[in-house]
Design a protein with these regions (language model features):
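Beta-sheet-rich non-transmembrane sensory/scaffold domains
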Residues: 1-373
Length: 373
């Protein structure tokens, strides 16, 4: 190990946190995670700094804590090491470390409430004689010292977690093999979490987004329940007003979609429940199935959702045929496309410029602004 720096200053030894390695587990390298705090009135100087020895690639930040998750493994199983560093009033506080069985899907697999960390993981590994490989899922509740105080294990055997989201005392997570169980878990008693409902539908959601107070939007893929083959991109709306009886109220299928960055980068999704709008960019393979060479098949879909009518398409835009790109749009350009609205105007923001559309006039294009080269 080396001593890390913040700017030109070496970090003091008592501000470097070294978690105790778990016996018989390996790590994919070790690097420093350095966090600094600055005051707004004097931003060129750090008020405090903390370093953690970690290989973490998943992070979650709550109101008063920073969590990092590192995958560790031995020859039979995978675990996730969690490190917590507290922060309050511009100062970092003592850390804590713990671990759970399995691996996290992404940062939405973690959530803090009432000084407890709730985690969902996919657990897989070999038995003692390496004759059988198994996969299941677990839900764990850790206290402020990151010790497990409650858990549910062996959920959805043979499946893996595809999406998760938490709200208050309820956790929602999707597992998948050939069908899509959406679980709702009661977390009101941290020591005794329980599954309240399990909804089985075809396909699976890759991303969950709370859509107003009592609805949950799922975006992912529709699949054939017999073969598991993808048949289209799916948007599902779930009624979560009663977590013990979650229902899918509507679904919308986009055919022939090959890839969608928004499923893995939530910043790429426009979600505006008050406007009843959501949108995302997606791609369709042409003759060449290399994603980096499909420069003529990028689109933006804008949809609405109302309780009475369900999902309704508002606009499909062929982005790379627009005057901004004129057929020369790259995959990197596509990944940076964003949709926003201001008042009654919808704007498509890209690397090459902005295009505006009037929502009240059936999304009539009203103007284009190209960035100067």
């Amino acid at each position: 190990y080396y001593v890390p720096r913040c700017g030109e200053e070496y970090i003091a030894y008592d501000h470097i946190y070294l978690p105790t390695p778990e016996k018989d587990f390996s790590y994919n390298g070790r690097i420093y995670l350095v966090a600094g705090a600055v005051a707004q009135e004097n931003p060129d100087q750090a008020t405090d700094v903390m370093a953690v020895v970690s290989s973490a690639n998943i992070f979650y930040v709550s109101e008063n804590n920073i969590y990092s998750a590192t995958e560790i493994w031995n020859d039979r199983e995978t675990r996730t090491e969690i490190v917590r560093i507290g922060y309050r009033d511009g100062k970092f506080t003592d850390g804590a470390a713990g671990s759970v069985v399995g691996e996290l899907h992404n940062n939405f697999s973690m959530n803090e409430a009432d000084d407890c960390l709730r985690i969902v993981t996919t657990v897989e590994g070999w038995d003692k004689d390496y004759s059988n490989f198994s996969r299941s899922n677990g839900l764990y509740v850790l206290n402020e010292k990151l010790k497990t105080i409650g858990k549910i294990e062996d959920l959805a055997e043979g499946e893996q977690i595809k999406a998760a989201r938490f709200m208050g005392d309820t956790g929602y997570f999707v597992t998948y093999r050939n069908t899509d169980p959406l679980f709702a878990a009661d977390l009101s008693d941290p020591k005794n979490p329980r599954i309240m409902s399990e909804l089985n539908i075809t396909g699976f959601s890759e991303y969950l987004h709370f859509y107003g107070e009592n609805q949950l939007l799922g975006i992912g893929w529709e699949t054939d329940p017999d073969t598991g083959n993808v048949t289209g991109m799916k948007c599902s709306m779930f009624d979560i007003s009663d977590p013990s009886d979650v229902r899918e109220t509507d679904r919308f299928i986009l055919k022939d979609v090959s890839f969608c960055d928004a499923l893995y980068n939530y910043h790429a999704i426009l979600a505006a429940p008050k406007k009843s709008l959501f949108g995302f960019a997606y791609g369709i393979y042409g003759d060449n199935t290399d994603v980096y060479d499909s420069s003529e098949n990028y689109y933006y879909a804008l949809l609405s959702y109302h309780d009475q009518n369900g999902f309704e398409p508002q606009m499909y835009l062929n982005i790379n045929d627009s005057e901004l790109f004129a057929g020369s749009m790259s995959y990197q350009d596509y990944c940076r496309v964003r949709g926003v609205y201001i008042g009654d105007m919808f704007y498509l923001v890209t690397e090459k410029g902005i295009v505006s559309y009037n929502i009240q006039k059936d999304y009539e294009q009203t103007g284009t602004l190209k960035w100067e080269a």
